[in-house]
């Protein structure tokens, strides 16, 4: 399963910019990988872990702006179609328990 987080946060005031940085750093600390600007994705192994991650994001949501989350299966994620650009694969993103580099 994958959790995809989309967000559009204001960056007008210094407080807005700080909230944006803090939320982005929170996602990265939780293991999310950037797919695009303001679109982050995390691989989770089961529904229990997914529920925990979703509730953690809800607790750390910014004060203002738009934050959306969706959970998709690995099969659905694999069917993603790239219309322009290329898939970046410089990050190891696997559900295998052992990754040999």
From Swiss-Prot:
Q: Which cofactor does it need?
A: Mg(2+)
SUPFAM superfamilies (alphabetical): TTP0101/SSO1404-like
Q: Write out the entry's keywords from A to Z.
A: Antiviral defense, Endonuclease, Hydrolase, Magnesium, Metal-binding, Nuclease
Listed GO MF terms: metal ion binding; RNA endonuclease activity
Q: Domain of life, per the record?
A: Bacteria
First-tier enzyme category under EC: hydrolase
EC annotation? 3.1.-.-
Binding locations of Mg(2+): 8
Pfam hit, one? CRISPR_Cas2
Q: Which GO terms describe its biological process?
A: defense response to virus; maintenance of CRISPR repeat elements
Tell me which family the UniProt entry assigns to this protein: Belongs to the CRISPR-associated endoribonuclease Cas2 protein family.
NCBIfam families in alphabetical order: cas2
Complexes and interactors: Homodimer, forms a heterotetramer with a Cas1 homodimer.
Q: What does this protein do?
A: CRISPR (clustered regularly interspaced short palindromic repeat), is an adaptive immune system that provides protection against mobile genetic elements (viruses, transposable elements and conjugative plasmids). CRISPR clusters contain sequences complementary to antecedent mobile elements and target invading nucleic acids. CRISPR clusters are transcribed and processed into CRISPR RNA (crRNA). Functions as a ssRNA-specific endoribonuclease. Involved in the integration of spacer DNA into the CRISPR cassette.
What this protein is called in its record is CRISPR-associated endoribonuclease Cas2
Q: Which organism is it from?
A: Filifactor alocis (strain ATCC 35896 / CCUG 47790 / D40 B5)
């Amino acid at each position: 399963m994958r959790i995809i987080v989309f967000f559009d946060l204001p960056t007008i005031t210094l407080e807005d910019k700080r909230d944006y940085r803090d939320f982005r750093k929170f996602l990265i600390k939780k293991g999310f990988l950037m797919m695009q600007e303001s679109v982050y994705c995390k691989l989770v192994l089961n529904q229990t872990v997914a529920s925990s991650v979703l509730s953690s994001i809800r607790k750390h949501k910014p004060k203002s702006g738009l934050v959306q989350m969706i959970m998709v299966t690995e099969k659905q994620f694999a069917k993603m179609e790239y219309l322009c650009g290329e898939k970046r694969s410089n990050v190891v993103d696997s559900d295998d328990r052992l990754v040999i580099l």
